[in-house]
Amino acid sequence: MKLFLEKSRFLRFLENTTKIIESNNSNYELRGAYFQVRQDKIILISSNEDISIKNEYLLDGIKNKTEGESDFLVLNSLLKNIIKKCSDSIILEKEKNTLKIFSDLQSYEINLLDHERFPDIKFGLNNSQLQLKTEQFKQALKNVVFAADLSNAQELLLNSVNLSLKNNILTLVATNRARIAMQKIKTEDSQEFNLTINSKVVKELISLSMSNTLILSPGTFELKIKSGNLEIKTKVIEIPYMNVENVFPNKFNFVIHIDKKELLSLIDKVSIVNDEKNGNKILIEYNPSKKEKKLKLSSYWPDLGFSEVFSDNFEVESEILLKFFINANYLKESINVFDGMISIFITENKDRMVISSETNLNNKQLIAALRGH
């Protein structure tokens, strides 16, 4: 079998399909890229056990063509590094258990892995299918995944994103208990499903290049996705997700309206004197009894020092005293899903903050208060 390929197009295809491969995977075969070469296309499959990808590279019979058909499994990291060194035109030639690569005055030879030991992954969509705009879905994932506890390998639900479809609304949720991020997408689909996927898988989904639309196809033990020639299969977490809708309060006694850029600037300035060990803690204060009514953010760390910043570029709906300790990183990540003016709602007992904005009415963020100094 001999393949003739355009480097730039093939490299884009290879990198997009194999970016999920883990070079240190304990299953050695999963370090490989599995090629199935046919007369009109190349089928490429990759997997890291949690997520698997199948993609097709169409052969035009001119600059991209094959002489013969074959299946082979090649160490992905080695193949990719070689392709990057090649010039514009590449020839891949399989002979028995080796793959030879030629490009102008360069030549390489790689020993192949045993493709028969590569897992038999069943792609193809399930009966349940939901069509979405790809960018809308990926943005929704971005708007919630940061709230998951990526370092928590013990409590799977806190290191995951939940997707549920009910009453024509697809709801995406992530939480680490100290905060919740929720995004909703309106659909025209009346079916129902509820599934949870690991946050690492979510980040891998976001990174993939896809066509303009995609199909979500939930199953009992997996979520399948199809976008153009790209097919994805991911594992789901088989533990019921907690209901977080009722955690969001609906009664508040303090509301701040402030521009996102203004608040981000304040957080960046005050966080210079801060530390991860201190929980990146800052204090938000408002005192209506003072002559000059300003919003104050301050940070104190015994071994580092003290900082405070003020703003008069804001509005409040309640002339009451406010003191609210919060994780600065959580606040920054939450407001970054919005643009322009944001609204911050604080409960009467000052234990929770809810953030929303007219710029993204389908998203809301909740952050629990930290204890004071």
Curated annotation (Swiss-Prot):
InterPro entries, per database record: DNA_clamp_sf, DNA_polIII_beta, DNA_polIII_beta_C, DNA_polIII_beta_cen, DNA_polIII_beta_N
Main location group: cytoplasm
Please name every pair of cysteines joined by a disulfide bond in this record: none
Spell out the subcellular localization from the entry. Cytoplasm
| A biological process term (GO) from this entry | DNA strand elongation involved in DNA replication
Short name of any one Pfam family annotated for the protein: DNA_pol3_beta_2
* GO MF, any single term: DNA binding
Q: Which Gene3D superfamilies match?
A: 3.70.10.10, DNA Polymerase III, subunit A, domain 2
- Sorted UniProt keywords: Cytoplasm, DNA replication, DNA-binding, DNA-directed DNA polymerase, Nucleotidyltransferase, Transferase
Any one annotated GO CC term: cytoplasm
Q: Which SMART domains does the record match to this protein?
A: POL3Bc
**Subunit-structure text:** Forms a ring-shaped head-to-tail homodimer around DNA which binds and tethers DNA polymerases and other proteins to the DNA. The DNA replisome complex has a single clamp-loading complex (3 tau and 1 each of delta, delta', psi and chi subunits) which binds 3 Pol III cores (1 core on the leading strand and 2 on the lagging strand) each with a beta sliding clamp dimer. Additional proteins in the replisome are other copies of gamma, psi and chi, Ssb, DNA helicase and RNA primase.
Per the record, the similarity remark reads: Belongs to the beta sliding clamp family.
Q: Which PANTHER family did the record assign? A: BETA SLIDING CLAMP (PTHR30478:SF0), DNA POLYMERASE III SUBUNIT BETA (PTHR30478)
Provide the function of this protein.
Confers DNA tethering and processivity to DNA polymerases and other proteins. Acts as a clamp, forming a ring around DNA (a reaction catalyzed by the clamp-loading complex) which diffuses in an ATP-independent manner freely and bidirectionally along dsDNA. Initially characterized for its ability to contact the catalytic subunit of DNA polymerase III (Pol III), a complex, multichain enzyme responsible for most of the replicative synthesis in bacteria; Pol III exhibits 3'-5' exonuclease proofreading activity.
Protein name as annotated: Beta sliding clamp
Q: Which gene encodes it?
A: dnaN
